[in-house]
Amino acid sequence: MVPTGVGSLLQAALTHARVSDDGPRVLAVEPVTAACATASLAAGEPVAVPADVATSMAGLNCGTLSDLAWLAIRDGLDAGIGVTDEETARAIEQLEADGVRSGPCGAASAAAITAMLGCPDPMELGADSRIVLVSTEGR
């Protein structure tokens, strides 16, 4: 689960994950207000979304993917999910309780786990799944 703004970190994760055919599945995590990777994946082409709505995840509030990142996203991203500021705030609290000091962008991946509960799971997670949460912002 990779926090995604313009897509450069996501591109790096996808490039690594796709070295072998049995690499991990990769999920882009974005603010619901600026989910350009998810929208682009669904459209099959780069889509710019308005990023003029305030969000606590300022570092992910981009609205447009880099052209170079799009190629890796198009060819390798399994799914994307948008998270709200409220979900991210709860994730920050949970991470803090577990001894991890994170800001909103860093907690977005943890928020995605909770957001996926009760929804159709694009990643097909099970009891034996290993999940890697990438945190891009500590405090």
Predicted regions span which residues?
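Active-site-adjacent helical/loop segments in soluble small-molecule enzymes
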Residues: 65-128
